[in-house]
Amino acid sequence: MAILGIVAEYNPFHNGHLYLLEKSRQQGDFSATVVVMSGNFLQRGEPAFCDKWARAEMALTAGVDLLIELPFCFATRSAYYFAKGAVQLLQRSGVVTHLAFGSESGQLSQLQEIAGILAHEPESYKTALKKRLSQGWSFPLARSSALQEYMGGEKKQLQEILPGPNNILALEYLRVIEEEGIPLLPLTIPRQGSSFHSSDLSPYSSARAIRQALYHNLDWEKITNSISPATEKILQREIALGRAPIGPDSLEQAIMVNLRLVSTDYLREIYEVSEGLEFRIKEATNSCGTLEELRQFIKSKRYSLTRINRTLLYTLFALSKNQVELYDQHGPQYLHILGFSAKGQEILQKIKIKSKLKIFSRGSEMKQARDKNPGTALAEMIKLDCQATDVYSLLFPNPATRRAGRDFTTSPVPGT
């Protein structure tokens, strides 16, 4: 039995996601589709536009069968660790056979060749990479340049492939599959429509363009070309209930307050803080009044704005280097079910037989596992996910909806 796996954020679900879903299904005789989806915080270090259950519901209306949450400790990391956590979660489900993903290039063999270099790190490539990093280059730029040097004659092709955000994730999925010998069969579908950074609205608008339109209260008629009627209905409901929209800098005051209260010793223990960055953050905090000012103050040749954004999020959640080491050593420890269709419920029964991971389809199961396993990777991962949900809930526009403990009280979203 072939089961299709996809990794996504669905922030929100749009026509491009539907295109990937439909085109991927055409590549084989798949009995179901399982999606690993980020929770309330995303890979760029930002909160989602609306919560994870609303986004899961959007996907279910489009034909996804089962949605599993990617834990915060992987969902908010760099592309490699995001991909690693997601691919491990699909593999550890015990039932997923294929992994589909979008890419700007659409050339699987080409992407696999590059991913093989990243996985095995030939000596000359490694030397070129270290040289650039020692010169203060950011990791993405250093890696891109080192690959171009190593692959020589394919420089022009690489210059077209490496910057694409979908290609970047595609390479990391393939790299993890190669490194760990994971038996997932990869499929790539060429990306359709506007680039991530485009603000144009079209039938294949980027999620960013749709969010920007919603933040600025543009006419729904302009937005509906990019999303399904079901997604529109869910978005309108969440906005009416005061559970959306959540802006990318909604945590600004919380982060700024926390940074002014903590010490450089505290910051030094935070994941991704190194080479004296704690002093730069502290200096910036005392002289800046907004997150954007803070990011611009801290950014450098080595630290990109996205990396800084993630690091600032880690400071709020006190995500330490030791914690991350624990999470990476053990990988995903559970399957938190966000939603399922009737077919998804059948797949879930198969997962219960084949997977060694704990499965949480009731909040009480999650709470019990956390309380009975103190200090373990399992308990710490659950604790962090629940903290993330509780903090996220405070961002809802409607104060009446901001209660804590929603992971323990919210059931998986039912599909058809």
Curated annotation (Swiss-Prot):
InterPro entries named in the record: Cyt_trans-like, Rossmann-like_a/b/a_fold, tRNA(Met)_cyd_acetate_ligase
Query: Which residues of this UniProt protein bind ATP?
Result: 7-20, 102, 166, 191
Query: Where's it mainly located?
Result: cytoplasm
Q: Under which EC number(s) is this enzyme classified?
A: 6.3.4.-
Alphabetically sorted, this entry's keywords are:
ATP-binding, Cytoplasm, Ligase, Nucleotide-binding, RNA-binding, tRNA processing, tRNA-binding
User: Which GO biological process annotations does it have?
Assistant: tRNA modification
Gene Ontology cellular component terms for the protein in this record: cytoplasm
List the Gene3D superfamilies. Answer: HUPs (3.40.50.620)
Q: Where in the cell is it found?
A: Cytoplasm
The UniProt entry, under Pfam families, shows: HIGH_NTase1
In alphabetical order, the GO MF annotations are: ATP binding; ligase activity, forming carbon-nitrogen bonds; tRNA binding
Catalytic activity annotated for this protein? cytidine(34) in elongator tRNA(Met) + acetate + ATP = N(4)-acetylcytidine(34) in elongator tRNA(Met) + AMP + diphosphate
Tell me the protein family, please.
Belongs to the TmcAL family.
Q: HAMAP family this protein is in?
A: TmcAL
User: What the protein does?
Assistant: Catalyzes the formation of N(4)-acetylcytidine (ac(4)C) at the wobble position of elongator tRNA(Met), using acetate and ATP as substrates. First activates an acetate ion to form acetyladenylate (Ac-AMP) and then transfers the acetyl group to tRNA to form ac(4)C34.
Entry protein name: tRNA(Met) cytidine acetate ligase
Origin species: Syntrophomonas wolfei subsp. wolfei (strain DSM 2245B / Goettingen)
The taxonomy runs: Bacteria, Bacillati, Bacillota, Clostridia, Eubacteriales
